Amino acid sequence: RHSYFQDEATNADWGYSQSMTDGAVLSNVPGRPVYLEDGTEVTRVPVGEESLKAWMLPGSYIYMYDVYGKELNTFAKLTTNFAGKTGPIHHRLILGADFRNSGNLGKGKVFDPENPPYRNLSYDFASQRNRAFKDIPFMNHLGVYAEEKIQWLMGKHELNISAGIRWDKVCGFGDGFSPRINASVDIIPRHLTLRGAYGITLKAPTLLYMYPDKAYFDLVNFNNASTSAPDGQKFQVITTRVFDAENKNLEMAKNKKCELGLDLKFNKMRFFITAYQEKCDNGYTIAKSLNTFKSVPFVQYSEITPRPSDESQIANLKEIATNPYLLSYTTPMNALKYLVRGIDFDFDFGRVDAIRTAFNLNGSYMWRKSGSNNYMFWNKIT
């Protein structure tokens, strides 16, 4: 699978580093060191990143990226059935297990590091890097379940019960149980049936929530590109900070649903109505948390003047300020909550043979309320 995107970035003059390492300090010329006036080296180039650079992007440029996907999914299922009868009660037992394996062997999002995609304006100094899908571990999902179906004949009345439980395990993530029960009983045989159900469904996260991209930030420590310095003496110094956005406390989303219904049959007419409620308090979302705010030292430099007479030599720097700077990013969370209530109905008034016409009325009503269990954050400017 392959997709392609191209756009123009405007007001894009912002710092960008090619480094993938937290704490790396690069200049705009690969491997070139930058020093303070006392000879202390400002740049910190990680091993293996000697050919990388950090620079100021132009105010406007065309960027493009490709997304290469090569999905691989496997599925296996094993089921066995047992049936029997005890007096007026018919039993049917179902036991089974299934296994799912899913992942992607593609190259993922690929772009020219000289022209990276437009940054996220919602986060100061935010940046992004290439990441291959094949570097993301495969998801292994195992499920084991059991279900018992009972049919009990009580004279002309019939009681049907189906009860089951399922255990799900996502390797490297977590597990949980999801029980459910469905029942129906004839109040008036062949005319009125009462139905009810209750169940819990566990939803495993996708790979996006299990293995999110790291949060990259490129802080511009020095930039004299807009000064009168000769081109050979214009340079930038940029510090890269990298944070793991994975949430180790993420858990399976739990959905609780119950319903109650009536089935009415009279002559050729049939009326079905069902009321239901669905509730979830830990659905998946991506948002900020108390742990995704990071205070980092932000060092700023200025040039030592006069500049070297050799225009191929850059000036040394001096530190003018070091202040704490609050960076923030998002992480997968169980913060989504919602409540759904509704009614479904289907009224079949039967066929009127005299005019060869059948009348049917069906519809539904749904009410939904959603919100977040997360804290609300905002910047207070004084």
Annotate each predicted stretch with a short phrase.
Residues 152-157, 277-280, 295-382:
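Gram-negative outer-membrane beta-barrel transporters
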Residues 2, 227-328:
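Membrane-embedded beta-barrel scaffold of Gram-negative outer-membrane proteins
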Residues 1, 7-14, 48-51, 62-63, ...:
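Surface-exposed extracellular loop regions of Gram-negative outer-membrane beta-barrel proteins
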Residues 2-6, 99-105, 140-142, 165-171, ...:
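Transmembrane beta-strands of outer-membrane beta-barrel pores
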Residues 6-13, 106-112, 173-179, 207-212, ...:
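Outer-membrane beta-barrel translocator domains and adjoining extracellular loop/strand segments
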Residues 1-2, 74, 91-97, 159-163, ...:
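Transmembrane beta-strands of outer-membrane beta-barrel proteins
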Residues 15-159, 210, 318-320, 336, ...:
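Outer-membrane beta-barrel transmembrane domain signature of Gram-negative proteins
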